[in-house]
Amino acid sequence: MVSLMTSFVVETFVPGGSQDRFTADVDGIRLAAEAHVAVEGRVHHVRSYLVPGDEMGFHVIEADSIELVARVTETAGIEVERIVEAVSVEPGRVADDAMEGAS
């Protein structure tokens, strides 16, 4: 059985909310993730979001560890505000905790 990777959100500052700059950052993360897979373990860029009005970029990365995510962003030359673990809740699913609170 294959174990699931942990999801992380990488928060970055994108000066001026530049889509060109953000696209370059995303390309860098994808290339760095591919390079690290061959050497260090499992890491996968899932998706990225730019919030131009706030000059913020958010990258969802699945990996075996937060340290691996940090190495990927460093290799990509991305200046990171923070990296945090994230939990995905799929549409139509109700968490066990929510069900317990409803009774």
Task: Mark where each language-model region is.
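Short, well-ordered beta-strand segments in beta-rich or mixed alpha/beta enzyme
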Residues: 8-12, 46-68, 72
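An amphipathic, aromatic/His-enriched active-site/gating alpha helix that lines ligand/cofactor pockets
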Residues: 37, 62-89
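Short S/T/G/P-rich N-terminal loop/turn motif that feeds into the first structured element of a domain
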Residues: 1-38, 42-44, 51, 88-103
